Amino acid sequence: MKKIHLSAIIAALVLSACSAPNPASGVSGGRSGFTLAQQHWSDVTKIRAEARRIGAKVRDGQMTKVQAAQHLNRFRLRTSGSNIVDDSVYEIYLQAMVDSQRGTITAAQSKAMIEHALRGWQQRWPHLKNKPNNHAFNNWLLEFMGMQPLQ
């Protein structure tokens, strides 16, 4: 099995080239009455663009993975704000970056940590009573990992 280098996975995460779905603004969640914020997909796009920009800095050695994760967090807070889903996913994302930068986990383990957190929210989402309407950071990561976004 070919070894995957952590820097390649991190660069892939921060250099996400996925295109955002373009649903009608204010996508409804069906019977629950849930509606995504009108700017949600625009915010996902902004986070993706910033991730690409800082990913180049990581690749060039101008920024560490942890610094990039912290910068991306500040950006997502300014862009889409704080909410239970994004805050929770970011904590796992940051821990994965810290552990991988320290060399205590492999690239595969880092990816698995993030996927596990995302899957947890996919399972909780249908039962969540007070769903945040702009969980752009979470949906950016879900799309990048090839998973279904929360809507």
Q: Where are each of the predicted segments found?
A:
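C-terminal motif of bacterial Sec signal peptides marking the signal peptidase cleavage site
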Residues: 14-17
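Bacterial signal peptide processing site
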Residues: 19-21
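Mature extracellular/secreted ectodomains of secretory-pathway proteins
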Residues: 55-142
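Short, solvent-exposed mixed-charge patches
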Residues: 149-151
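Post-signal peptide N-terminal segment of mature Sec-exported envelope proteins
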Residues: 25-54
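Bacterial N-terminal signal peptides that target proteins for export
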Residues: 1-8
